[in-house]
Amino acid sequence: MGSLPPPSLDFSSIDHNSLKNGGSSHQEISHDNLLNLFKSQQDLLNHFFKHLDLSQTLDFSRILLSTTGTVFFTGVGKSAFVANKVSQTLVSLSFRSSFLSPLDALHGDIGALSPRDVLVFFSKSGATEELLRLVPCARAKGAFLVSLTSVSGNPLAGVCDMNVHLPLQRELCPFNLAPVTSTAIQMVFGDTIAVALMAARNLSKEEYAANHPAGRIGKSLIFKVKDVMKKQEELPVCKEGDLIMDQLVELTSKGCGCLLVVDEHSRLIGTFTDGDLRRTLKASGEAIFKLSVGEMCNRKPRTIGPETMAVEAMKKMESPPSPVQFLPVVNEDNTLIGIVTLHGLVSAGL
């Protein structure tokens, strides 16, 4: 076997100051230069908006809206990231959509395509070899093919059923190479189409929330009081005849800041808070040792039902005359079934 010649080690030409700065020379980014870059990018995006063919865009939107199958998106490199993102946006809006890798498609994944589907190609140049190889295979599956390109007369546009031209004056990159404007245009185009489809389908806020159960908007429209309340052994419960001093552990150990006073049938009588404890101690002194919870509790507390939306519980806590930190949860006959706390609502992401 052959071998590589030994390296020639010459350290005399090394710029040690350059090494300290990461191995390359840098210039400061000035305020004016940065501002000019943003203005230039704005001008490039304005060129896109000014020259976009709305008739092409409308036809494309209607095809996506009317498809009875799945809308697949594909691309290579940075365009692949855009294609994937736009696809996921549509999925979040209850549209059947998916990203199709052009490489994986040629190794089995193209089996997902059917004659009812639409395949959308994101490509700046329209000359990407991987996408051109995919076209005849996708056509054999019967899918409708759409290219979104920025170069006129490109080969991909010529072999697809439809092309939408995304006008691009140039890239912001000083070499006109890095796809920093073309991808922005692709993203703006894709997301705007997604919103147009959303409006055409009359997607409701409730449907949107159902697709985002972990997000704040989803939780606010899905979670009910019964989903976030404490219950059973978590409740700081006592009877009205119990002495205040005998219930200090119950008052302080359940993390609710209160006692829930109930009768023998678990119907709510009132509440006694840690604030009530401080006020009673200040007003009564040693007499507090003989006072029962029932004598000092609030017999008209705010309450809420288990089927009420959790976000409404938060509003009720914050309503006049003064905010509260908790709400006892009762059913129709005032039987205590839980407690919802402000801390619990915040922890749930509401």
UniProtKB/Swiss-Prot annotation:
SUPFAM superfamilies recorded: SIS domain (SSF53697)
Binding residue positions for ATP: G75, V76, G77, K78, S79, A80
Top EC category: isomerase
EC number: 5.3.1.13
Short name of any one Pfam family annotated for the protein: CBS
Any coiled-coil regions, as ranges: none
Residues in SIS domain copies: 60-203
Catalytic reaction equation(s): D-arabinose 5-phosphate = D-ribulose 5-phosphate
GO MF: arabinose-5-phosphate isomerase activity; ATP binding
A biological-process GO annotation: carbohydrate derivative metabolic process
Disulfide partners: none
Lineage: superkingdom: Eukaryota
Positions of substrate binding: 94-95, 107, 133-142, 167-169, 295
PROSITE patterns named among the record's database cross-references: CBS, SIS
PANTHER family: ARABINOSE 5-PHOSPHATE ISOMERASE-RELATED (PTHR47476:SF2), PTHR47476
Function field: Catalyzes the reversible aldol-ketol isomerization between D-ribulose 5-phosphate (Ru5P) and D-arabinose 5-phosphate (A5P).
Family: Belongs to the SIS family. GutQ/KpsF subfamily.
Protein known as: Probable arabinose 5-phosphate isomerase
Organism: Arabidopsis thaliana (Mouse-ear cress)
Lineage, highest ranks first: Eukaryota, Viridiplantae, Streptophyta, Embryophyta, Tracheophyta
Originating gene: SETH3
